[in-house]
A protein has these predicted regions:
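Small/polar residue-rich beta-strand/coil "junction" motifs that cap repeat-based extracellular fibers
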Residues: 10-11, 21-24, 38, 74-133
């Protein structure tokens, strides 16, 4: 733990950001006020959090939760294994969901939101219906 007020727990874990926390083997929290929890998780964006094995939160104010999830856009959120939120202010919710455009939301397993200011509940060739609305 090299950052001021930081904590690192686990073999080869590192908490170099000020007020950061890294918990798990190889976990790394280098962003200020960041938290990485889980084997090989990374929280490098300031005020970011990554939880789950291999999760990564590199954008400022980003949150990645789930094994292999990635939140690289500023203010992005990825929840679910292998989910990815790379657009600014984007959210990917569900296993393998991808929100790559700015201000986009991908909802559900395998959903893709690749247009700005959009909400997707499926992907090309894997369309879904909204019911009981």
């Amino acid at each position: 733990a090299g950052g001021t007020g930081s904590t690192a727990i686990g073999a080869a874990s590192s908490a170099s950001g000020d007020q950061s926390a890294a918990v798990g083997v190889g976990a790394s929290a280098s962003g200020a006020n960041s938290a990485a929890i889980g084997d090989s998780s990374t929280a490098s964006g300031d005020f970011s959090s990554a939880s789950g094995s291999g999760s990564s939160a590199t954008g400022s104010f980003a949150t990645a939760s789930g094994a292999g999830s990635t939140a690289s856009g500023e203010n992005s959120t990825a929840v679910g294994s292998l989910s990815e939120a790379s657009g600014t202010n984007s959210s990917a919710l569900g296993n393998g969901a991808v929100a790559s455009a700015n201000d986009s939301v991908a909802l559900g397993n395998g959903s893709v939101a690749d247009r700005a200011n959009s909400v997707s509940v499926g992907s090309a060739g894997n369309e879904r219906q909204l019911t009981n609305v």
